[in-house]
Structures are given as structure tokens and as C-alpha cells.
Amino acid sequence: MFCSMLACGQNGEIGLNGELPWEGQYPEDREFYEGQTELALRIGTRGAIAHFSPNRPCCLISANVQKPKDCIYVYNWKKLSVEQIFADIEERVEFQKKIIVGGVKWYHATASFVDRIYLTRIAKNFDSDRKVDLSIILANRKKISSRSARSNTELIFETWE
């Protein structure tokens, strides 16, 4: 199963100077992310995967084919289609769950190919230099669940299929 996982502000804000605009403000969102990705393969761009660890497997999507230590594979999505990348990952990697973790262009490119989307909406505006377009990411999707965070009413956790 391929999924996308993202959190964004009211206007799609997801990044500022290489970090989350709300970095450190929402521990429950961080816990949700880590819980979902703990036993999954993370797939994302260099800016989206901040830390490489043998305990947190990942594949990079990058035109720079240099493979960081503790990264399983690097895919150049300028040369390979989303379908080719997903098929190769499916063939090579035994993880049942594979999660797209960013960046913006990769979220948009994979939106119609993923089986499920985990979206954390933050009911607040943020300064940002990176925004996602939720109309692309959620096109032709149905919301299957929604819940407010226990600790902060600004957070809403949604699941889309």
C-alpha cells in the first residue's frame, strides 16, 4: 500500500526555510507522523526527509543520485515515471506500507497513484515558502475519517481514499 502523509496550514503551507512552519508547536502531530511511519518505508525528497537512520528506512526522490548513508535507494523522477518508481519499490522492498512524505512536487505527482492520504489540517495561517495544492492532492478522493486532536483543537487528522 502506498500512502501520502502531510500536514499543512489553512492555505496549504508546509515549509519555511527547509523546516515546518510550525516546528515543535504540535507534539501530537509529530507523534501521529512517527507512529504511522515507524514500521513503514518513507519515500520523499531530500528536503522532506531530514534524518537518515537504519531504524527509519527511506527512499529518496532526487535528481542528485548520491545515496546518503542509511538510505535504501535513490530514484531520479526526472528520468523515471511515478509508476516505474512505485513498481520498482514494490518489487524490491518488503514493507507493506510505503508513505510519501514530501516535498510539494512529489506530493502532487503521486497524488493520483497513492491508495490513502493521511492529512493533518492545522486551522491556522503560517508564513511559508512551500505550499501544497489540496485540490490536486485530494482530487477524486473521499474522506473516510476525521478527528480533532486530543491536545489542540487547531489540529484535525483526516484520512482520504
Model-derived regions, located:
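Enzymes that bind and transform nitrogen-containing heteroaromatic metabolites
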Residues: 1-161
